[in-house]
Curated annotation (Swiss-Prot):
Belongs to the ZipA family. It holds the Pfam family ZipA_C. Residues 42-186 are annotated as: Disordered. Keywords: Cell cycle, Cell division, Cell inner membrane, Cell membrane, Membrane, Transmembrane, Transmembrane helix. It comes from Escherichia coli (strain 55989 / EAEC). This is Cell division protein ZipA. The chain crosses the membrane at residues 7-27.
Length: 328
């Protein structure tokens, strides 16, 4: 029984709550609907009031113009003033009534447009009035009168500078380079030359005298005049000397007994022109130098005691040809 009562109370309470909620929603919607219905009316009324106020302002502005036309009807003007003060219902009539006189009011400004064109031609009349006032150019000629005085002063030194400038190129001796071809003619005048080669020990060492003597003799050199060795046309020492070998250390002489002899190097030289073909003699001289260097463990150097190069060999050959052509 208790459980049935609880269920009944719960159901009744739920129904009551639902009824209250439905009643609340219904009343709220009713109030909202009434509010929305009243708002457009209020808006319309407010708009009408605003329109009536604007029309009153327009009537007040245009009443002056309307009064001009109704000057003879004095009582009608008094009624219009009294009608303008009451409720806005009477204010809707003046705009319609004043709408007719407004059209002629807009026309007079159109009639005033032509007089505006009339003053325009008067403007060009004023422009020439400003144009004939060139009083300022009268001041400009005053300044050039002062300017010409310094201008000739500056123009005077300019010709002086120009006078100095032509003097400088006159002093420049440009034709002197013509004398350069003269030394070129001196080269073919060389009628003799000395071709020099050196066979030297490596840096910090010296050539052994006994090894040096054996290599010199194998190359065909024979001890002779001026206490140096000579390479003759024939290996037995007969015939003219083709080139010679001297000591690199001054005075350049040798001692035939070279067992205890040491030297940093020897010099081989050939005088051009020489007997026979100088180019062939030069090749024989180069072969002798290379043979001696290989035997004693030295190197072949040029006349400046630098490592012999193919370029230096061609230079020696060119010198030999030059001397041969000069003596031809």
């Amino acid at each position: 029984m208790m459980q049935d009562l609880r269920l009944i109370l719960i159901i009744v309470g739920a129904i009551a709550i639902i009824a209250l909620l439905v009643h609340g929603f219904w009343t709220s919607r009713k109030e909202r609907s009434s509010m929305f219905r009243d708002r457009p009316l209020k808006r319309m009324k407010s708009k009408r009031d605003d329109d009536s106020y604007d029309e009153d302002v327009e009537d007040d502005e245009g009443v002056g113009e309307v009064r001009v036309h109704r000057v003879n009807h004095a009582p009608a003007n008094a009624q219009e003033h009294e009608a303008a003060r009451p409720s806005p219902q009477h204010q809707y009539q003046p705009p319609y009534a004043s709408a007719q006189p407004r059209q002629p009011v807009q026309q007079p400004p159109e009639a005033q447009v032509p007089p505006q064109h009339a003053p325009r031609p008067a403007q060009p009349v004023q422009q020439p009035a400003y144009q004939p006032q060139p009083e300022q150019p009268l001041q400009q000629p005053v300044s050039p009168q002062v300017a010409p005085a310094p201008q000739p002063v500056h123009s005077a030194p300019q010709p002086a500078q120009q006078a100095f400038q032509p003097a400088e190129p006159v002093a420049a001796p440009q034709p002197e380079p013509v004398a350069e071809p003269a030394p070129v003619m001196d080269k073919p005048k060389r009628k003799e030359a000395v071709i020099i080669m050196n066979v030297a020990a490596h840096h910090g060492s010296e050539l052994n005298g006994e090894l040096l003597l054996n290599s010199i003799q194998q190359a065909g050199f024979i001890f002779g005049d001026m206490n140096i060795y000579h390479r003759h046309l024939s290996p037995d020492g007969s015939g003219p000397a083709l080139f010679s070998l001297a000591n690199m250390v001054k005075p350049g002489t040798f001692d035939p007994e070279m067992k205890d002899f040491t030297t940093p190097g020897v010099t081989i030289f050939m005088q051009v022109p020489s007997y026979g073909d100088e180019l062939q003699n030069f090749k024989l001289m180069l072969q002798s130098a290379q043979h001696i260097a290989d035997e004693v463990g030295g190197v072949v150097l040029d006349d400046q005691r630098r490592m012999m190069t193919p370029q230096k060999l061609r230079e020696y050959q060119d010198i030999i040809r030059e001397v041969k052509d000069a003596n031809a």
